[in-house]
Amino acid sequence: MAPKKKKKVTGLIKLQIQAGQANPAPPVGPALGAHGVNIMEFCKAYNAATENQRGNVVPVEITVYEDRSFDFKLKTPPAAKLLLKAAGLQKGSGVPHTQKVGKVSMAQVREIAETKKEDLNARDIDAAAKIIAGTARSMGITVEG
């Protein structure tokens, strides 16, 4: 049997799409169409993979190969979105260092850090929590504890 040839990568697409709600309309359609990917095939696969995370924005990294096939890797939801959900807010502060818009506890920050640990370049949970706390501060959310 001949050894498997590694497929040649022709593109890498990064998108942030609502979980379970990918459709061929912009921004998904044009981004994938430019690389010749079967858009409906991706939408069905993405929606099936993110069905249990509805309500979150789930970033996805799509690797497109020479033969127009693709693989995709799901990431964890953005820290900013998780912080807004934890604080019960719609959006962060326009002037974060002077106007605070919400509060989260250190326990909530650690919980978000646990969720995001695989995507953060932190060695332990304390370092990951510091990264998340910094994101919260830059959004005008106070971290208590």
UniProtKB/Swiss-Prot annotation:
Post-translational modification: One or more lysine residues are methylated.
GO biological process, one term: translation
Entry-linked Pfam families: Ribosomal_L11 (PF00298), Ribosomal_L11_N (PF03946)
UniProt cross-references to InterPro entries, sorted A to Z: Ribosomal_uL11, Ribosomal_uL11_bac-typ, Ribosomal_uL11_C, Ribosomal_uL11_C_sf, Ribosomal_uL11_CS, Ribosomal_uL11_N, Ribosomal_uL11_N_sf
Gene3D superfamilies noted in UniProt: Ribosomal protein L11, C-terminal domain, Ribosomal protein L11/L12, N-terminal domain
CDD domains: Ribosomal_L11 (cd00349)
Record key words, sorted: Methylation, Ribonucleoprotein, Ribosomal protein, RNA-binding, rRNA-binding
GO molecular function: large ribosomal subunit rRNA binding; structural constituent of ribosome
GO CC, alphabetical: cytosolic large ribosomal subunit
UniProt superkingdom: Bacteria
The keyword Translocase belongs to this UniProt entry's keyword annotation: no
Subunit details: Part of the ribosomal stalk of the 50S ribosomal subunit. Interacts with L10 and the large rRNA to form the base of the stalk. L10 forms an elongated spine to which L12 dimers bind in a sequential fashion forming a multimeric L10(L12)X complex.
Function description: Forms part of the ribosomal stalk which helps the ribosome interact with GTP-bound translation factors.
Family membership: Belongs to the universal ribosomal protein uL11 family.
Record-given protein name: Large ribosomal subunit protein uL11
Organism whose genome encodes this protein: Corynebacterium glutamicum (strain ATCC 13032 / DSM 20300 / JCM 1318 / BCRC 11384 / CCUG 27702 / LMG 3730 / NBRC 12168 / NCIMB 10025 / NRRL B-2784 / 534)
Upper taxonomic lineage: Bacteria, Bacillati, Actinomycetota, Actinomycetes, Mycobacteriales
Gene name, Swiss-Prot/TrEMBL: rplK
